[in-house]
A protein has these predicted regions:
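A structural-propensity feature for long, helix-poor, extended segments
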Residues: 209-251
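Acidic, glycine-rich active-site loops and adjacent beta-strand->loop/helix elements
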Residues: 176-179, 202-206, 226
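Short hydrophobic alpha-helical runs that function as membrane-insertion/retention elements
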Residues: 196-201, 219-222
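Mobile "lid/hinge" segments at catalytic clefts and subdomain interfaces of large enzymes
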Residues: 1-36
């Protein structure tokens, strides 16, 4: 319907009326723009910002948590093991009901792998306390006692490893993760829970692998076949920062209480 027919219909009390059938008189009253209407309802902050005023966030808008830099060495705990042929980004972080948490990183992270491995979040948080202890200058093995035999095993070959040169975090194994949408929350949610890496036979998309890297996570590859670790195992990754800086393409890992193997 054209604009005049809409006007004719409105003038005819809502009865559908074509413009050429309207029997009334067309008038064009004078129009005067009143900017006060907008000045009273719309805030224009250009040139009038006050830096001393603290921004008030809504209850579901949260800042990103602090994220430590990559340490010289890493201790990773496998907290989820997924053997499906493909793991989608929607399985890594569901859509739908989680959309209201997009401005709340920690709130959104509570849904990570909830449809695939509901215990993942709890296990990742248990490991994260060790890294938080390191950032506070405390002993990670005191915060997470199960690390004591892990450090003992590491010290048999790397006696100089301590809280000053090691990071502790979680990792997951998936055969082929990252298929589907480009949502970066599939990686960021793991990161805010203390994730430091993914281990996979291959990555479903370049964009998921890139998202891992962008969020400071290591996209490890391992050949297909029997895994040299299981869910709950610890993996020691020595001199990982040096390897990243030198763009190394292959690496070795040490599983606590076991021997070295290629990763």
């Amino acid at each position: 319907m054209d604009a005049r027919s809409i006007a004719a219909t409105a003038a005819n009390k809502g009865f559908l009326t074509a413009a050429d059938e309207f029997t009334g008189t067309y008038t064009k009253p004078a129009y005067h723009f009143d900017k006060k209407i907008y000045e009273n309802r719309v805030f224009d902050s250009k040139g009038v910002a006050d830096p001393s005023v603290e921004i008030q966030f809504g209850p579901n808008i949260k800042d990103w948590p602090a994220m430590p830099q990559l340490a010289e060495n890493l201790i990773l705990k496998v907290v989820s093991e997924i053997h499906d042929p493909v793991t989608t980004t929607d399985e890594l972080i569901p859509s739908g009901e989680t959309s209201s948490f997009r401005s709340n990183p920690l709130g959104l992270a509570e849904f990570t792998l909830s449809r695939k491995d509901p215990a993942y979040v709890g296990r990742a948080k248990e490991v994260q306390v060790a890294e938080k202890a390191i950032q506070e200058g405390n002993c990670p093995a005191e915060a997470l006692p199960e690390l004591k035999p892990v450090f003992a095993a590491i010290h048999t070959q790397y006696p100089d490893i301590d809280k000053t040169n090691v990071g502790v975090g979680s990792t997951i194994f998936a055969v082929k993760p990252g298929d589907g949408s480009a949502r970066e929350q599939a990686a960021s949610c793991q990161k805010v829970l203390g994730g430091w890496a993914n281990i996979a036979n291959e990555y479903a998309t370049k964009r998921y692998r890139s998202n891992l890297i962008n969020w400071g996570m290591l996209p490890f590859l391992i050949p297909e076949g029997d895994l040299p670790f299981t869910n709950g195992d610890y993996i020691f990754v020595p001199e990982i920062r040096k390897a990243v800086e030198e763009k190394a393409v292959s690496y070795t890992h040490l599983r606590a209480h076991e021997t070295c193997a290629d990763l």
